[in-house]
Amino acid sequence: MKKFIQDFKAFALKGNVVDMAVGVIIGGAFGKIVTSLVNDIMMPPISLLTGGVNFTDLKLVLSKAVVEGGEVVKPEVSWNYGNFIQTTVDFLILAFVIFLMIKAIMAAKRKEEEAPAAPAPTPPEIELLTEIRDLLKKQ
């Protein structure tokens, strides 16, 4: 049991696992931001352009609800394709933003790799020896 706990600790504290956990947490929060962007910022103008259609309300009713005495006896059965449209827009925006972020990271890495390393400064001893050599050549 002790070995199992040690193995788990080694696994859980590896850099990649911790990085992945942080990524999942940030990704979840970022997903909420994108959902809000789509629902609250992008879809209202689209709804305005389409004559006030709210995409989340779009559905195809397969069987209507049965109401008797003000009480629903049989609930409505519907195919809610509007939610699918909304979720697809969310996904496309999220995928596009992640694509842009990865492109930016890759470009920064490429730039870092392409930048030549500055030459190391010549030690003073070498400079002195070079000067002595040059003076001896002149004589």
UniProtKB/Swiss-Prot annotation:
One of its GO terms (cellular component) is plasma membrane. The chain crosses the membrane at residues 17-37, 88-108. Keywords: Cell inner membrane, Cell membrane, Ion channel, Ion transport, Membrane, Transmembrane, Transmembrane helix, Transport. It is found in: Cell inner membrane. It is a multi-pass membrane protein. Disulfide bonds: none annotated. One of its GO terms (molecular function) is mechanosensitive monoatomic ion channel activity. It comes from the Bacteria. Gene3D superfamilies: Large-conductance mechanosensitive channel, MscL, domain 1. Pfam families: MscL. InterPro entries: Mechanosensitive_channel_CS, MS_channel, MSC/AndL, MscL_channel. NCBIfam families: mscL, PRK00567.1-4, PRK13952.1. Homopentamer. Belongs to the MscL family. Channel that opens in response to stretch forces in the membrane lipid bilayer. May participate in the regulation of osmotic pressure changes within the cell. This is Large-conductance mechanosensitive channel. It comes from Porphyromonas gingivalis (strain ATCC BAA-308 / W83).
